[in-house]
Amino acid sequence: KQLGYKIQFIFDESDNISNPSSKQTLSVLSCFRRCKYKLLTTGTSTRNNISEFAPQLELLYNNSINMISWCRTLYSYDKRSADMEHKENPYYGMPIPAYKKGYRLFANSHLPEKITVFGVGQRNQDIYNADELDRLLGKTVITRTFEEVTGKDIRRIHQMPIPFLPEEREVYNIVLKEFYRIQREYYSSTGNSRKDALMRLIQQITLLLRISAAPDCMKEYEGETPLKEMAVVEALARWPEEVVAIGVRHTAVLDPYAAAIREYLPERPLFVVTGSTVTFAKRRALREVLRGSRNGILLCTQQSLPSSVNFEFVNKIIIPEMHYNNAGMSQFYMRFVRYTSTEKKDLYFPIYIGSLESNLMQMVLAKEKLTMFMKGQDADMDEIYAKFGVDYDLLSTLMTRETDDEGHLRI
């Protein structure tokens, strides 16, 4: 206020204000929305849904005549019947309102429902009023892709579809059909029965995805080394002279992979890195140690690698445990895909077919379609499938959520 808002504001990683309810978003908006000169930079303006872009628009335009709602029709889903409803836009020709009212209007104008692991197979993820959104993006967003800047496309994505072994399917079915029996072994009660009931499905989904990453992280598993871990070990054995990076999301999944690599490839140097066990300074020093190993294996949690350290000499990356969107995973694998890279980078996604992981992959692809649209690259799902190396019928492997005779949700 003392400067009359005559300041220049540059905001890197502006997608950090994608959550309109967070204190960070509210603080940034209250401090800088009236600044005269603003530049927002980010690798991806949205991660999960289009409405995440609304706070960034609000920061740029401050709900002025530069962000007018030109969508004549608003869309929403009826929660009971799941039917699409539409109505006239009461704010047509007016600036989009501030805060929650504006975020709701923005979502209902373009994508009225979030993409979920079950919704990907039930509803298409088309963008409504796409021309109006494209017109707004056209005057707001300037996009330069990695390929445009470097003049080369060095990323190659490979899918590794893997079937369940009987013992792996057995532990998967325990969580699927008898979750009530083992729930308290993995999740503590909140002390509130209503909250416990609301959390049950989320906890079940989380555990199913954990099993899909490493079945032997469950004590109910009674088989040998799971097939996915063996597929990763066999891939490592095919690259005896390569430095390889493996990224998971949870330490509970990391431990089984570390044990399998030590058992089957004891001669290969193994570097295990997590944010909680290795200091930041050691993680930065890891770069030269890994390069000097010649054929070392970096096994880490995806969020543990500091963004200031790059490993451009690593050409093989395996991701056995996926994030909920490609933006989250790219924060990890782009540590290895750099502007200075000269060799091709191979990304591998081992996936258990017929598990909830298939739904997760389809959700990642659906979100990637939205992300590409926000960057001015309107692509259909066939192009997205080709980009991610999906050459099998992914939709036929999706799991569904149903309501039983007693009104309980079941997967």
Regions inferred by a protein language model and the residue ranges of each:
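Signature of the SF2 helicase/ATPase Hel1-core->accessory helical subdomain module
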Residues: 2-105, 322-327, 336-338
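PAPS/PAP-binding and catalytic site of the sulfotransferase fold
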Residues: 49-60, 172-173, 257, 310-311
